[in-house]
Amino acid sequence: MAAQDQGFKSLRQLSASDKEFCFEMISHITSNLDLTETQLSQLKTAYRAIGSYLANQGGKLVECHIYAQGSVGIGTSVKPIDEDSDMDIDLVLHLPSQHYPTTTDEANELLFNLIRVLKDSQRYGDKIENMPKRRCVTLQYGGIEGQGFHMDITPSMPEDMDSPNHKSKVRVADIKDANSPSHPYGYRKWFRSACSKEIRWNRKSNYRSNNDIYAGTVEPLPGQGRKTVLQIVVQLLKRHRDMWKQNKQNVYGDCAPISIIITTLAGLAYEKCSNSNKEYQNPFDLMLDVLEEMPNFISHQYQSNGTVKYTIRNPALPTENFADKWHEKPMLPQAFKAWYTQVTEDLAKLLELDQGLDKTIERSREMFGSQATRGIQAKLADTLTERRAKNRAVVSSIGLGVSNAATATPVPKHNFYGDV
């Protein structure tokens, strides 16, 4: 039996109370990876100010629209392992009246012009980097509450000038290919739609909607809404990937799976679970099904030269293949397989029965880092005390008292966490 199959088997054999404890612990871990309310608010203010400044420069910038893409836009941000490292914030600067470049010279000119405009600003002149990246310019924003940030600003233009809105398909400047098709708004919309899909909970389940996830113990950011199972799973996998990548025993180096692949596979798997009409007893079982289904959305085709072409389609732009580099660099699919096997093995080891809470916390720290597990033991102990006070606690074989009774309380309709 494959290592990951054995891992899934052992995880599925956990008792109902252990599964509740496990997902509650995972929820606490991912909450430590979130941006704070202050950080989110100041970032939103910061990039809106950038948009206002650019719009005031006239010309093609007058009607520009700036918005967050990537993890910040879909509520799956993960703080860096090294707390001294900057966090990437991906922004799209849409230019509705600008034709997309058709040559690499035009792409270079567009990006350097954007740098020049920001250089002329007293506010941004010392923050903008002198050279563009392949598709964006970078603004070193500085720190908020001890966390450093830099903003990658990607200019986009309408693919069809008859549909200039940023909500349509776009082209982004690309100094190697002149332009690249993209649909960042569509991807964000797709992922948010996946998050909001209803799950069928068993009539004996404590859960009645996506929002009923330990509502009494996992605090959402005020005004940001409660995270869904899908967002929690993506954050967990991304942090595990980050830790796995820097492990000295990892022979794959920078070939670790990129975030867009992890996020897309998890989102597609979650949609399949929702559409299956399967009834779930708890979010832990849903998480396991999502993990197990992820590889099924990677297609492969053998080429005449003996190589394999892999495809992971962008749900918002099916012509885009997120695995396009896997064909050229065989280490990439090998790294994905190695990481995927490792994450299932690690989760099984983390949740081994009879190891006690202290050992579980120690293993979670090794797997996700000290930042992610900060305060987790106290949080779980507080939860146990609260449940015992209500005479609803039973003893988990993992070593923490957890409740078989309802632990989640209804919450309002989900307002997307990280909606910036």
What kind of region is each of these model predictions?
Residues 64, 69, 73, 143, ...:
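Catalytic residues for metal-mediated phosphoryl-transfer on nucleic acids/nucleotides
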Residues 219-351:
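Conserved nucleotidyltransferase catalytic core and NTase-mimicking acidic/glycine-rich helix/loop elements
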Residues 93-97, 270:
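Short beta-strand-to-loop capping motifs
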Residues 53-58, 74, 108-182:
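Conserved catalytic core of two-metal-ion nucleotidyltransferases
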Residues 1-30, 295-420:
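Terminal (often C-terminal) interaction modules
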Residues 150-222, 393, 399, 420:
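Extended, alpha-helix-rich binding/interface surfaces that flank or overlap catalytic cores
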